[in-house]
Curated annotation (Swiss-Prot):
UniProt cofactor(s): Zn(2+)
Protein name as catalogued: Zinc metalloproteinase
Lineage: Bacteria, Pseudomonadati, Pseudomonadota, Gammaproteobacteria, Legionellales
EC number(s) recorded for this UniProt protein: 3.4.24.-
Signal peptide extent: 1-24
């Protein structure tokens, strides 16, 4: 396939010259220049002037115009030298004439922008090989992505003006690269025609890909249906205008549709979102494969919508309350939360595997497990792993599991200002025989969990030993002058700074006291709460 590039008639006519750089280009700030001065040095192609009529080496080519409410017409132009576009050379004419032209433009017309003089002396004319080598420059650029799916390759011969105002013959090259696991990118570079080294390079898909808003529905038959954009905030999604596709992804969260399979390339769920008069101004689009706001499954309105919202809330909760990322990469930079939904067949669970969160769609006992609480729970396993590293067995395992339950309640509290003190009530089906997975106010209500440390025994499942710290959290948050946020403050601080991988219940209590002291919270209230769940703090040293 031949590359796409544009040459003006003038460029073709003089492309057989010889280049002879001499000196730097001279920038002309147009706010300080008169219209007559500009027209003496540059040929303007205002509306009504045919492109083929351009005979000057230096020209300002018409791009577009519009007239504002003050009846001033603003005409945008790009500088060309020898028929090739000049990097950074743009002029805007501001005319009170409704149809500005060279004949009607006045000498005192206002302009702004920057154009460059002296290019003739610095560049001379392009070498015969300048245009011919454009295809070669593009191919070398494409070779960097030889193992990727590449399309829409483009090359434009041009003049590049560097930061020192030196002018260079150059090529602007770009390709569209399709990835299996993330949004497409458009690598773009301006390359030196002599050395093939880039002057600048960037991902140009950012000019087409915009943060957009998603409308849609969530919930399930038990809790009812709610609407994002009405009952809850609009969803933060991403849109690629070049292909009119939306992606269930933003800088914080990516939602992957597993399609009821067990393996995935982690490509974000995507759907067609065409521009309409209604969406053009609001940048708001209905989510779902049919763009109706749904991707129904097992009684739930849209697991993808709920997953995106849950991830967004959880990440922002940690950031807003504690100034930290929910999860980070090995170099300490923020980690995008990957929420995988529609996992497997009849899978009634959710998990964190060290890299991502995965949610089943439930079966006979549960609706899809993508509630805010379950999402907060799974993400917070990652938070614990990256901070205290509480091992997932014994008493430390119970603390690990409990911290995630606490985070589930905190996410609800952060989102709507209240919480249920139950884990998973929103996903349990009405005929399952259970109204929740666990209860923080009285953990033993589930028939398996323990309420106090004295009831712990070796080998107890961590989901049941979590009852001790779940109960502790409930008691502390309900002390006079306390609330859920304050209680979670203590637990987060302890997890980050005091707990260790093999902490026992008692050692965890000491960490809580140290954390509370750091925060300036009442230690006696903590001691009282610890006593109620038979955690011994007598050996704790808090200076």
């Amino acid at each position: 396939m031949h590359p796409n590039y544009y040459l003006s008639p003038l460029a073709v006519a003089i492309a057989l010259g010889i280049a002879s750089p001499v000196k730097a280009a001279d920038p002309i700030p147009l706010q300080k220049s008169s219209f007559s001065e500009v027209t003496q040095k540059f040929q303007l192609t205002l509306p009504g002037v045919m492109k083929g009529a351009v005979v000057s080496t230096n020209s300002l080519q018409f791009i577009r115009q519009h007239t504002d409410g003050n009846k001033v017409t603003h005409v945008r132009m790009q500088q060309q030298y020898a028929g090739f576009p000049v990097f950074g050379g743009y002029a805007i004419l501001h005319s009170k004439n409704a149809t500005p032209s060279l004949a009607t433009a006045k000498s005192d017309e206002k302009m702004n922008g920057v154009i460059y003089d002296g290019l003739q002396a610095e560049l001379g004319q392009p070498k015969p090989s300048f245009v011919k080598n454009a295809s070669m420059a593009l191919q070398q650029f494409k070779d960097k992505y030889a193992n990727k799916q590449v399309s829409e390759d483009q090359v434009t011969p041009m003049i590049y003006i560097d930061e020192k105002h030196q002018a260079h013959w150059a090529y602007k090259v770009s390709v569209l690269v399709i990835h299996d696991d993330r949004i497409p990118e458009r690598p773009t570079a301006i390359i030196d025609a002599e050395t093939n080294k880039p002057f600048v390079q960037w991902d140009d898909v950012k000019t087409e890909k915009v943060q957009a808003k998603g409308m849609g529905f969530g919930g399930n038959r038990k809790i009812g249906e709610y609407q994002f954009g009405k009952d809850l905030p609009l969803l933060e999604i991403t849109r690629d205008s070049s292909v009119e596709m939306c992606f269930m992804e933003n800088t914080d969260v990516k939602v992957v549709d597993m399609g009821h399979k067990y393996y995935s390339n982690n490509k974000p769920m995507q759907f067609t979102c065409k521009e309409t008069p209604d969406t053009q101004s609001t940048k708001t689009y209905y989510t779902g494969y049919s763009a109706d706001g749904y991707d129904r499954d097992n009684g739930a309105a849209s697991p993808t919508n709920d997953a995106l919202y849950a991830g967004y809330v959880i990440k922002h909760m940690y950031h807003d309350w504690y100034g930290v990322e929910a999860l980070t990469k090995s170099d300490g930079s923020p980690m995008q939360l990957v929420m995988r939904v529609h996992y497997g067949q009849g899978y009634e669970n959710a998990y964190w595997d060290g890299k991502q969160m995965t949610f089943g769609d439930g079966d006979t006992m549960m609706y899809p497990l993508v509630s805010l609480g379950v999402g907060g729970h799974e993400v917070s396993h990652g938070f614990t792993e990256q901070h205290s590293g509480l091992e997932y067995f014994g008493q430390s395992g119970g603390m690990n599991e409990s911290f995630s339950d606490m985070a589930a309640q905190a996410a609800e509290y952060y989102s709507v200002g209240k919480n249920s003190w139950q884990i998973g009530p929103e996903i349990m089906k009405e005929d399952s025989g259970y109204d929740a997975l666990r209860y923080m106010d009285k953990p033993s209500r589930d028939g398996m969990s323990i309420d106090v440390a004295d009831d712990y025994y070796g080998g107890l499942d961590v989901h049941y030993s979590s009852g001790v710290y779940n109960h502790l959290f409930y008691i502390l948050a309900n002390q006079p002058n306390w609330n859920l946020r304050m209680a979670f403050d203590v637990m987060v601080k302890a997890n980050m700074d005091y707990w260790t991988p093999y902490s026992t219940f008692d050692e965890g209590g000491c960490g809580m006291l140290s954390a509370a002291k750091d925060l300036g919270y009442n230690l006696d209230d903590i001691k009282k709460s610890l006593s109620e769940v038979t955690i011994n703090y007598q050996s704790c040293y808090v200076d």
